[in-house]
Amino acid sequence: MKKLLAAAAALATVSTMAMAERYVMITHTQGTDPFWPVVEKGGRDAAAAIGAEFEYNFDPSGDMSGMAKLIEAAAASNPDGIIVSLPDADALGGAIRAAADAGIPVVTMNSGLESSAAVGALMHVGQPERLAGEKAGARAKAEGVTNGLCLNQEAFNTALVDRCEGYFSGLGGDLNMIDVSNDVTQIETRTAAALSADPSIDGVLAVGPHVCAAANKAIKDVGADVHLSCFDLSPEVMDMIQAGDAAFTIDQQQRLQGYMPVIVLHLYNTNAGMLPGANIPSCLLYTSPSPRDLSTSRMPSSA
């Protein structure tokens, strides 16, 4: 009897393992941005909470064709769902649509809110990027900025372009955006060159945390008196805000962007296609210094 019970338990364990859900997340990081490990951890934590397997992939080259191939490879492995950032719908849309047409549920996250439904995704989890940029620009204007510069480390990424365009919509004035790349040395060099070429620039928006840190160094090297604001959180950005080197950052809640798609897909797969009634906007939050610590305040939900 004991042997029979042991065999039954072993069979149940094998069956449970075979039935475990498996989700694949693919993002456009090149592995240098401190933003994305937080997203990945959110996905892994969600998968652990529901007992699912989780895979995380990215193309270190940052090439969109390479990312599309990763999506195709994930679809070929027949997972229970794919989670993907969508910085370039033209380059990635075909692979995402093919996965959806093959019956694999897809949720987009982070970038690609406007294109998510068109490429066949069930829904999107992420920040409304243009609105976030507008709020950053409006706050910079209220804090005295008159002539801005937006630093974009991924020229192909429509979400970052939306942030920059929104910034100048809120600030007023024509778009002044430069491609600084993801290389820290290039970010510093190009930012310093732009500030030296136009000393009237009194406001800089960095649309990524590592860009913000590099921009801060460039500003100090040039000796410019510039209002610096950022997107996203990192320990270095938090220290910069506390020290007064950055005015504020906009926290788009990247852990939520990694966590919620896994939960959404789990509910979809285990509850007869249940989905939230709308896309899930990750919170628009300002993080700025208070006398004792870093305070966080929610932005208004509309422009």
What positions do the PLM features span?
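Extracytoplasmic "Venus flytrap"
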Residues: 23-42, 46, 50, 55-71, ...
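Short beta-strand elements in bilobed, periplasmic/extracellular small-molecule ligand-binding domains
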Residues: 50-60, 150, 170-184
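Hydrophobic alpha-helical segments within soluble ligand-binding/sensing domains
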Residues: 67, 123-148, 187-188, 233-237, ...
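Hydrophobic alpha-helical
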Residues: 71-72, 80-101, 167, 176, ...
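Conserved small/polar residues in nucleotide/adenosyl-binding loops
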Residues: 286-293
